[in-house]
């Protein structure tokens, strides 16, 4: 019988995901500016949805780039 270790979320469930916290949001996008999938980030489904909304808001307000041309 094998046991699976439960992965802990990198963000505490009680912590809000804010679109103004650009340093936190940058951890969850690729160098090209794409949002990382949930299986890579280790977030819960609710946190991943909130993260996607926050990243999209930050992009609209020009806090994050839509497409990063540097990479």
UniProtKB/Swiss-Prot annotation:
Biological process terms in GO annotation: translation
Gene3D superfamilies (alphabetical): Ribosomal protein S18
Keywords annotated in UniProt: Ribonucleoprotein, Ribosomal protein, RNA-binding, rRNA-binding
Organism: Synechococcus elongatus (strain ATCC 33912 / PCC 7942 / FACHB-805)
SUBUNIT field: Part of the 30S ribosomal subunit. Forms a tight heterodimer with protein bS6.
Listed transmembrane segments: none
Keyword check for Ribosomal protein: yes
Protein name (database record): Small ribosomal subunit protein bS18
Its job: Binds as a heterodimer with protein bS6 to the central domain of the 16S rRNA, where it helps stabilize the platform of the 30S subunit.
GO MF annotation list: small ribosomal subunit rRNA binding; structural constituent of ribosome
InterPro entries listed in its UniProt record: Ribosomal_bS18 (IPR001648), Ribosomal_bS18_CS (IPR018275), Ribosomal_bS18_sf (IPR036870)
Family from the record: Belongs to the bacterial ribosomal protein bS18 family.
């Amino acid at each position: 019988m094998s046991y699976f270790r439960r992965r802990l979320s990198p963000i505490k469930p009680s912590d809000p995901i804010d679109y103004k916290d650009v340093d936190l949001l940058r951890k969850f996008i690729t160098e090209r500016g794409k949002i990382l999938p949930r299986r890579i980030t280790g977030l819960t489904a609710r946190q991943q949805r909130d993260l996607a909304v926050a990243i999209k808001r930050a992009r609209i307000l020009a806090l994050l780039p839509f497409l990063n041309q540097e990479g």
